[in-house]
Amino acid sequence: MSDINGTRLPWLATCPCVGEDVNPTLSRGER
């Protein structure tokens, strides 16, 4: 699981387009 997390962080940073799409989704889930 740790490996996936480490790979996911840099992946999102490299793909700001996808990160923006996931940002609103995560914010909604937290709210």
Curated annotation (Swiss-Prot):
Residues excised as propeptide: 1-10, 17-31
Molecular function GO terms recorded: toxin activity
Cross-link annotation Cyclopeptide (Trp-Pro), location: 11-16
Functional summary from the UniProt entry: Probable toxin that belongs to the MSDIN-like toxin family responsible for a large number of food poisoning cases and deaths.
InterPro entries recorded: Amanitin/phalloidin
Annotated keywords: Toxin
Processing and modification events after translation: Processed by the macrocyclase-peptidase enzyme POPB to yield a toxic cyclic hexapeptide. POPB first removes 10 residues from the N-terminus. Conformational trapping of the remaining peptide forces the enzyme to release this intermediate rather than proceed to macrocyclization. The enzyme rebinds the remaining peptide in a different conformation and catalyzes macrocyclization of the N-terminal 6 residues.
Assigned protein family: Belongs to the MSDIN fungal toxin family.
Protein name in UniProt: MSDIN-like toxin proprotein 4
Keyword Glycoprotein: no
Highest taxon of the lineage: Eukaryota
